[in-house]
Amino acid sequence: MTRTVNCRKYNQELPGLERPPFPGQKGEDIYNNISRQAWDDWQKHQTMLINERRLNMMNAEDRKFLQGEMDKFFSGEDYAKAEGYVPPSE
């Protein structure tokens, strides 16, 4: 049986993650309030930010920036986007 959560990002009941994505309170919050779909969307966006902004995950400031953008992404605030990116039209 698939576990569902009331997704903070999409404001609907959706399948949740199988386990917290990382340890601690932040991981538990994501596990309990973020859907699999929202997490997958964040992973794609995070990869784009790391590549386009040339973020170095060994750098504490870059990790802090990415953490802040993740919080904005999930809460519905305006978050950083890759400059010049145009999503493909369907």
Curated annotation (Swiss-Prot):
User: Belongs to which family?
Assistant: Belongs to the Fe(2+)-trafficking protein family.
Source organism per UniProt: Stutzerimonas stutzeri (strain A1501) (Pseudomonas stutzeri)
Q: What does this protein do?
A: Could be a mediator in iron transactions between iron acquisition and iron-requiring processes, such as synthesis and/or repair of Fe-S clusters in biosynthetic enzymes.
Q: Which UniProt keywords apply?
A: Iron
Organism superkingdom: Bacteria
Checking Pfam families in the record gives:
Iron_traffic (PF04362)
Gene Ontology cellular-component terms for this entry are:
cytosol
Q: Which GO terms describe its molecular function?
A: iron ion binding
Q: Does the keyword Iron apply?
A: yes
**Database matches in Gene3D superfamilies:** Fe(II) trafficking protein YggX
Name its GO BP terms in alphabetical order: cellular response to oxidative stress
Provide the leader sequence positions. Answer: none
This protein is called what?
Probable Fe(2+)-trafficking protein
Q: Carries keyword Phosphoprotein?
A: no
- State the taxonomy lineage: Bacteria, Pseudomonadati, Pseudomonadota, Gammaproteobacteria, Pseudomonadales
